[in-house]
Amino acid sequence: MRKLLSFGRRLGQALLSSMDQEYAGRGYHIRDWELRKIHRAAIKGDAAEVEHCLTRRFRDLDVRDRKDRTVLHLACAHGRVQVVTLLLDRKCQINICDRLNRTPLMKAVHCQEEACAIILLKRGANPNIKDIYGNTALHYAVYNEGTSLAERLLSHHANIEALNKEGNTPLLFAINSRRQHMVEFLLKNQANIHAVDNFKRTALILAVQHNLSSIVTLLLQQNIHISSQDMFGQTAEDYAFCCDLRSIQQQILEHKNKMLKNHLRNDNQETAAMKPENLKKRKKRKKLKKRKEGAKAEHNLKVASEEKQERLERSENKQPQDSQSYGKKKDEMFGNFMLKRDIAMLKEELYAIKNDSLRKEKKYIQEIKSITEINANFEKSVRLNEEMITKKVAQYSQQLNDLKAENARLNSKLEKEKHNKERLEAEVESLHSNLATAINEYNEILERKDLELVLWRADDVSRHETMGSNISQLTDKNELLTEQVHKARVKFNTLKGKLRETRDALREKTLALESVQLDLKQAQHRIKEMKQMHPNGEAKESQSIGKQNSSEERIRQRELENLLLERQLEDARKEGDNKEIVINIHRDCLENGKEDLLEERNKELMNEYNYLKEKLLQYEKEKAEREVIVREFQEELVDHLKKFSMSESPLEGTSHCHINLDETWTSKKKLFQVEIQPEEKHEEFRKVFELISLLNYTADQIRKKNRELEEEATGYKKCLEMTINMLNAFANEDFSCHGDLNTDQLKMDILFKKLKQKFDDLMAEKEAVSSKCVNLAKDNEVLHQELLSMGKVQEKCEKLEKDKKMLEEKVLNLKTHMEKDMVELGKVQEYKSELDERAMQAIEKLEEIHLQKQAEYEKQLEQLNKDNTASLKKKELTLKDVECKFSKMKTAYEDVTTELEEYKEAFAVALKANSSMSEKITKSDKKIAVISTKLFMEKERMEYFLSTLPMRPDPELPCVENLNSIELNRKYIPKMAIRIPTSNPQTSNNCKNSLTELLLRWALAPIYFLL
């Protein structure tokens, strides 16, 4: 009995553990590859992203992931209220089920998301849908002890008596899961107390099995049936007694006592409330029953007395007795009567026992035969099952070993692939990190260079601005100087015109002087003629004196005019000399400033040239280092691509392309730097060449001016020589005239002095002009030196031009090379882009193939795992079932064997007792036979004695009194005459057989129960 009870308890514990495993996992076990974009957005609670996905594709409203979960399931499981309202507004399916046939309402209740559950209930969700385990939303609310959710579900017409596959209502489920608050809540909401599960266990039995005394008190307060039995025939009190739960036993006993007291009170109240008429009727009925029983007893006694009288008459006829022995016989008769009564009672009991034993023998024989057949079949089935189990165990072990080997192999492959994948990912990440670092370094270097270029350009701009300001100032000064030079040229031209006019005047005067000299010669010739002729001398003298006076006046006027002209010439020469000195000073300043500027500019250009050379060297070094780094990265990429089983030719092409790209990039950088530097230097060279051209132009103009001045000086020299010659000639003529004319000698002396003075003045002017010419020669020498320095500058400029041409040629070569490189770079870029596209396409294809293979492999693995798990589960279940059956059979067999041994011992004890009883019975039979013979003899005597007595019986006889006092039913007296044999050996054997059958039946009763 205890084994059965312990089996029931273990079954309850197993059900509780399975229930905990079933209900413990809340929410979903989510993997990212199982989800779509809308499912990820729903899990995150991103309602905007969900709405965006739905606007793009309205079909995604009820779309499922790879585990058959909708967006509403995931949103309810994670408590995303906004997403749930959005989906319900879009009219999604509210009662849609997942793979376990669970609705979104079940998931919201299971995950204790009350807000989502309330929204679903308000929108009309069905709370009575069952999952694959038969559980409703109320079961999940009970498991989570959600009283508020349970109230909401009950207010929306949830079934409080819904049964799951185990036959548990929410109340029974709450007791199984030890949820006392939910039990109280369900009892308040009028849950059925008398509900039964698949094992016919009530709520009280479950509470006793789980040792929940508080729930037992609640159920007893609700007047639950105590005597209800489960499928094993056990009550709650039996389970409490078996499990030694004394507190629960006391509670049940107290409840029983209360129930009995209440029942007695109710009976008393009923009897008190009954009318007296009913009591009278009951009394009459009782009296009638007693009268009938008394009449039957009297009739039976009369019949017995008549039979006994007949027997006594016969005995009296056979053996007459004396009246003296009447007292003894009377005592013997009373003793015999008592013995007969005992014997009759014993015989009736024996008869009933025999009938029962026969009936039971037949039943037991049939049952034993059936049991033997069942045992034989059971043994055969056990043997067959053992053989089948051994075979299946061997097969399953082989299959398990094969599956384990396959799993190990697949796991090793998976681990290898994962390891390779991780290694490749690590390599790719390292390459990406290296590339990122290289790119960052490259970007930093470019930023530095850009900053340097910006600073350099800013410096250039500032320099250009300063140069522009200086050049603007110089241009302004040049404009002023050019204006001044222009004005000086205009004045010089005016002076030239005046000089020409004076030259013309001098020529006219010289012509006039020549004419005067001719006139003087003619006059002298005439005077000579006159002297020769001496006619009219005085008149002619007066005429000659008048003519001389007029000629002297003319000469004076001419001298005055010459003086004025000479003064004007001197003034003009002074002004021209001053202007020339100013112009020369300005030119010297300009030339000196230009030379200084050119020297400074040349120094700056040389410094910049050296700086650019140093930068080019640095860039070449950096380029070499980058090329080394890029080649290392290329080698790593080549190794990486080789690992992905790419062909060698595109890899070599990509490496060559990368090398060409690097070279083109470096050449681009160099060209860019060289282009930036020569552009700036070109501007500087242009400015220098413009300055040089201006200097050359100014030098040419100065040379032209010097030539013109030299020509003018030579002209002046020629004019002076002409004037000196003319004056000498004129003086000679004057002297000759005065030599001839003694009268006018003084005047001629005066004139000669004046002419000498004029000649001295002219000589002084000549010396001044010669000094000026010397100064001009010195200036010319200075200008020649300057021209020589300018020649050197020109040589330097020519060198610079040559360098510039060389640089331009280099730039052109670089441009051509750059164009070629650009063309090659374009081709390389196209080829690279094609290769990149091909590589990307190949990588994408490989990734897609890898992902597809991985997905297929994962699907296959999942299917294999599912199949393996399913097969293993099936095999385990079959093994468990077989083991359970086998264990049950073993336990039953062991129990049967132990009980059989016990029953054998009891049977041996019973046989001993039976043998002792049979011996006692034989002894009692012998005694009875002796007594019966004595009684028979005494009956015959009494009959004979009574036959001699009158027929009416004496009421004072004790035998008659005893017969009247004994109430014997007719049915217990046998109709046939009872024969008492002296010896009956079959009775003991029959008793033995009946006892053995009883013992066997009592021993095999639990086996029948188990079967």
Swiss-Prot record:
Q: Coiled-coil segments, which residues? A: 277-319, 385-639, 692-722, 752-908
Which of UniProt's keywords are assigned here?
Answer: ANK repeat, Coiled coil, Repeat
Which segments show compositional bias classed as Basic and acidic residues? 294-319
| SUPFAM superfamilies xrefs | Ankyrin repeat
PROSITE patterns cross-referenced by the UniProt entry: ANK_REP_REGION, ANK_REPEAT
What are the start and end residues of every segment in region (Disordered)? 264-330, 533-554
The ANK repeats lie at: 67-96, 100-129, 133-162, 166-195, 199-228
Q: Which SMART domains match?
A: ANK (SM00248)
Protein name, entry field:
Ankyrin repeat domain-containing protein 18B
Q: Which organism is it from?
A: Homo sapiens
Q: Which gene encodes it?
A: ANKRD18B
